[in-house]
């Protein structure tokens, strides 16, 4: 893309909008930032960009500025916003921050780092951080980026060089990323979430499935969640790209799984019909709850797709420590264990959390986001106390 003099509207300030506006301005684009909010924080961000020569319009994110040739949006902006409807009517393309990062790869002459991408309703952050830990254990220069930690755009255009990136992608980000082509990608699971944003479960799943499009080496799916394998079947991938499953049971050919407390690989071995490679022990996973073992298997599959040796998988999992609020052990008092899993913000994540324990007093709250809870409560009824 020749950015010089190109009129670009960036929709939204914040962790994605500010880096996008800065990167585009540095490449000669004529950037206008629009933002719905107008508060102290956004005014400070606006002042920072205006000092560079970027036009910022606060309190009005609905109107498409004249002469706009491209819109780059923050991932949370819904597709039915008036700004995007006006862009569609005018024939103006809309990209997300991930699409922009993908398009800017290598534009400084450096060899772009391949992306190992992870999406799913739950487990994305943990899996990406596990993957980054494994890649580091293999001696690779990497970072956990995307919807986590370091901005993906900053990782792509910044001075630090990487061998590979572990990329967390939300359904919002994938919706606006039509050109993304990962080295390998995983969809961990699919359950109703963000239906207020996507409009339907079908639209939500379709956006998740975009992560497989154009994959070159492996599409990793959850054997226990057939909807993820369906997305692999529907994807248009490069010749030779393989479907790789992960399961908490004994793996079949082209799968990773668990046998007698050992994480094993029957996908990336010389004879997957007769051989299995030991990767790590279940006890190497922290915490060793079933859903977290599944996360570890998905991370291992992506790492193995990138050529990482088994010892690095083991060492990376041993080095990994989970973030706060993810089945976090808080205290033991009067023979009761207190656990913080407040990152479980939908029914699927909550179901996985409750399944990790036999007897539970469950304290819950938050927004439903279009979901219902009857099946969750019925399924967990035997475990619930109090």
Provide a role label for each language-model segment.
Residues 32, 143, 361:
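Conserved beta-strand positions in the Rossmann-like core of class I SAM-dependent methyltransferases
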